[in-house]
């Protein structure tokens, strides 16, 4: 479960892993909802500077809030936005190199409008000594949403490169430290917060550190791609894990902090608990 922007945006994800010989299949179901979005399009009384309808004075009917005009609060309405997604990923070895293929379907509703989209991701990973490197090509060759109006909202391909390396500058018994870095490159997501911008190309990085004690307690900290600090804690038991992540708000703090809670359960552990209860 994830809560963002002080609870305005909420999302839930449920994931499963199905063992199929040596090629596991990962299934993920996603829901995201945004409620109480204000719609102010019908509030403007666009009657011009004199505030009287039908006089054709300057400003009447121009769609702009001019001096002398006002808003009708009774015309304020609210709508919501919902997304339901499905993602399936499988892993295969091609000439000894692990190759991942991900297929995704997204259903999107915005007020009275509806859209449907599909996409394909490709990825592979490689271990070089103690360093794990992964590369993901998203939306290959391209993907997008088809709206009920016939409009196609396209999404071009992007690339993500990640690396993980364990290290121990100071040896502490039963303690392991992991470092991680992620680079995201795109040609359509260029924005003012991009760390590197060259024409339409953008490149953003994220960094993280994770310390694990006795494979039970995890402490995490880092910086995301928009230079916001992140942190988190994780506790692991046999067949059961709880993780919490925290993301700071923007500089002004107007959008609130983000909170992410993850719960991981082992199916084998659940079945063993059920078996014990039945025996009792």
Residue ranges and their predicted role:
Residues 1-280:
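Subset of outer-membrane beta-barrel
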